[in-house]
């Protein structure tokens, strides 16, 4: 990918520092020239509070949700941020302690209560966090910040004010939903979450939220389950972070990283476990891929199997002459990558960060090709007949289809992650370019563009600079897929630099067009979107 940059100064630690929200927007200092057509807001989510009083959060996905906004107008940029007033945040601020258990941090009963009150408080049921630090997405004319539980939080994208909490369980049968829904051109929202199916077994439901209609009724009120995927283990659902969608098909990748529901319901309530304590790996299952017909709402019984990997982000999925092309950011093996994302590990000195990353699963960008039509007469043969891929699908005697991928990118401890594409033009359709955040031993230190057809790579990188997920914004008169810009929030703690800036790159070659510097640190952000006026 590039000559590997070292980080002995440990500037990446600034990504994990608590900051205060802003009372008014800051005017950014622009160098270069922001395209005049770039008008709107870059909205992003991430943790901004890494401790409450003397109580620290322990995992990358624990800090309290901070909502960020960069406004673009006539070549000028302003920056604003506010904490999302979730129940988790408001109660923590009120009681000056961690009140609701987060991903890797346990909340314990109020020490001021007597022993009987503290004991009985364990039996009120599992209290699920609403800490919406992962992503933002539109539903109708509204915007919601989300994590991966059943709670989403409606926010005002102009003022960043928190409007209300919404419990998806009140509308559809899911225990939670991913932070990576698919949004169709008409505004229809698709998402996936696990649920309890027939005979108290676990399954995965695809939920659909329709677009806003003329009656202006909240589309969430009309949410429905459109198809259900079975679970390989009746009591242990897999961790699901994203899924694939095309105009006609839904693809769900079931990995060996499992949630032990017995541990979740018992140990959590009685002994103070957290989400991370409830994960375990099934070392023998490998990966199961599932497909459903989106329009007919029907599950296919094709048994796609492959070797084990972790999966967080789908890049894109599309149909090609009777096959589904599924491009994924994989991590080899069955061990859970999140085991390596505790803040203590991420804040270590550079040599220790590298040592920890060497123990973790190896990242790789892969393309899997799934044949949709299976003929038993083809047992033992490669069913993939497409000329432009080396991926294979072998029909086995037990009627499983064993998949081997084509590797699109692989580098030692160098990940292409947090992928983005020209989603409006190419989501669920054939495409050429993907943009990603380059992780160097888990440290984000480069931005990348990948040609998925030729495997050519372009890159932006500077010393002591730590970018975020790249967001592609198409220019109004675009003719080609990569006509536009890429936006990324960069933390820059090096000598002689401003604390942070918004970077604007030419999407063609990742050359710098402009940057908008601000006089404040910006902690790590995970995902977001560009909202046009």
UniProtKB/Swiss-Prot annotation:
The PTM N6-acetyllysine maps to 113
Which Gene Ontology cellular component annotation is one that this UniProt entry carries?
Answer: endoplasmic reticulum membrane
Q: How is it modified after translation?
A: Palmitoylation by LRAT regulates ligand binding specificity; the palmitoylated form (membrane form) specifically binds all-trans-retinyl-palmitate, while the soluble unpalmitoylated form binds all-trans-retinol (vitamin A).
Q: Which reaction does it catalyse?
A: an all-trans-retinyl ester + H2O = 11-cis-retinol + a fatty acid + H(+); lutein = (3R,3'S)-zeaxanthin; all-trans-retinyl hexadecanoate + H2O = 11-cis-retinol + hexadecanoate + H(+)
Note the lipidated residues of kind S-palmitoyl cysteine.
112, 231, 329-330
- The EC designation for this entry is 3.1.1.64, 5.3.3.22
> Phosphothreonine occurs at which residues?
101, 105
State the annotated membrane topology for this chain: Lipid-anchor
Residues the record lists as binding Fe cation: 180, 241, 313, 527
List the GO biological process terms: camera-type eye development; circadian rhythm; detection of light stimulus involved in visual perception; neural retina development; response to light stimulus; retina homeostasis; retinal metabolic process; retinoid metabolic process
Q: What does the note under cofactor report?
A: Binds 1 Fe(2+) ion per subunit.
Q: Which UniProt keywords apply?
A: Acetylation, Cell membrane, Cytoplasm, Endoplasmic reticulum, Hydrolase, Iron, Isomerase, Lipid metabolism, Lipoprotein, Membrane, Metal-binding, Microsome, Palmitate, Phosphoprotein, Sensory transduction, Vision
Positions of modified residues (N-acetylserine): 2
The lineage's top-level taxon is Eukaryota
Q: Which family is annotated?
A: Belongs to the carotenoid oxygenase family.
Complexes and interactors: Interacts with MYO7A; this mediates light-dependent intracellular transport of RPE65.
Function noted in UniProt: Critical isomerohydrolase in the retinoid cycle involved in regeneration of 11-cis-retinal, the chromophore of rod and cone opsins. Catalyzes the cleavage and isomerization of all-trans-retinyl fatty acid esters to 11-cis-retinol which is further oxidized by 11-cis retinol dehydrogenase to 11-cis-retinal for use as visual chromophore. Essential for the production of 11-cis retinal for both rod and cone photoreceptors. Also capable of catalyzing the isomerization of lutein to meso-zeaxanthin an eye-specific carotenoid.
List the protein's name: Retinoid isomerohydrolase
Lineage at the top is:
Eukaryota, Metazoa, Chordata, Craniata, Vertebrata
Q: Which gene encodes it?
A: Rpe65
């Amino acid at each position: 990918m590039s000559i590997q940059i070292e980080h002995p100064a440990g500037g990446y630690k600034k990504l994990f520092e608590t900051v205060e929200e802003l009372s008014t927007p800051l005017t950014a200092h622009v160098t270069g020239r922001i395209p005049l057509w770039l008008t709107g807001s870059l909205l992003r989510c991430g943790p901004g509070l890494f401790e409450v009083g003397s109580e620290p959060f322990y995992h990358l996905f624990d800090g309290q949700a901070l909502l960020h906004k960069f406004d673009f107008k006539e070549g000028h940029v302003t920056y604003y941020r506010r904490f999302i007033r979730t129940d988790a945040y408001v109660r923590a601020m009120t009681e000056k302690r961690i009140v609701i258990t987060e991903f890797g941090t346990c909340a314990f009963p109020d020490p001021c209560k007597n022993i009987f009150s503290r004991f009985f408080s364990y039996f009120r049921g599992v209290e699920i966090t609403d800490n919406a630090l992962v992503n933002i997405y539109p539903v109708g004319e509204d915007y919601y910040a989300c994590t991966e539980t059943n709670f989403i939080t409606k926010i005002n994208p102009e003022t960043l004010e928190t409007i209300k909490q919404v419990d998806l369980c009140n509308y559809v049968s899911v225990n939670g939903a991913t932070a990576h829904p698919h949004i169709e051109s008409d505004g229809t929202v698709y998402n996936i979450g696990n649920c309890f199916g027939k005979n108290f077994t676990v399954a995965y439901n695809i939920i659909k939220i329709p677009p806003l209609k003329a009656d202006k009724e909240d589309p969430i009120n009309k949410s429905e389950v459109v198809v259900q995927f079975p679970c390989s283990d009746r009591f242990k659902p897999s961790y699901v972070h994203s899924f694939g969608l095309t105009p006609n098909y839904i693809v769900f990748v079931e990995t060996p990283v499992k949630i032990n529901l017995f541990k979740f319901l018992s140990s959590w309530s009685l002994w103070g476990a957290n989400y991370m304590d409830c994960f375990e790996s099934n070392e023998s299952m490998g990966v199961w891929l599932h497909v459903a017909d989106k329009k007919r709402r029907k599950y296919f019984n094709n048994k796609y199997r492959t070797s084990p990997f972790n999966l967080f982000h789908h890049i894109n999925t599309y149909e090609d002459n009777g096959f589904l092309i599924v491009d994924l950011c994989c991590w080899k093996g069955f061990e859970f990558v999140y085991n390596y994302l505790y803040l203590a590990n991420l804040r270590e000195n550079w040599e220790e960060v590298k040592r920890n990353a060497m123990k973790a699963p190896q990242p790789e960008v892969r393309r899997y090709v799934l044949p949709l039509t299976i003929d038993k007469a083809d047992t033992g043969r490669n069913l993939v007949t497409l000329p432009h891929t080396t991926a294979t699908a072998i029909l086995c005697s037990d009627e499983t289809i064993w998949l081997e991928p084509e590797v699109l990118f692989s580098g030692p401890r160098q990940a292409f992650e947090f992928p983005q594409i020209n989603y409006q033009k190419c989501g669920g359709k054939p495409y050429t370019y993907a943009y990603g955040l380059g992780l160097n031993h888990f440290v984000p230190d480069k931005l990348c563009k990948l040609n998925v057809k030729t495997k050519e790579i372009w890159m932006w990188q500077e010393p002591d600079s730590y970018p975020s997920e790249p967001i592609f914004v198409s220019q109004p008169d675009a003719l080609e897929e990569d006509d536009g810009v890429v936006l990324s929030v960069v933390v820059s703690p090096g000598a002689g630099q401003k604390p942070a800036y918004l970077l604007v790159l030419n999407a063609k070659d990742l050359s710098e067009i402009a940057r908008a510097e601000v006089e404040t640190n910006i902690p790590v952000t995970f995902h977001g979107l560009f909202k046009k006026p």
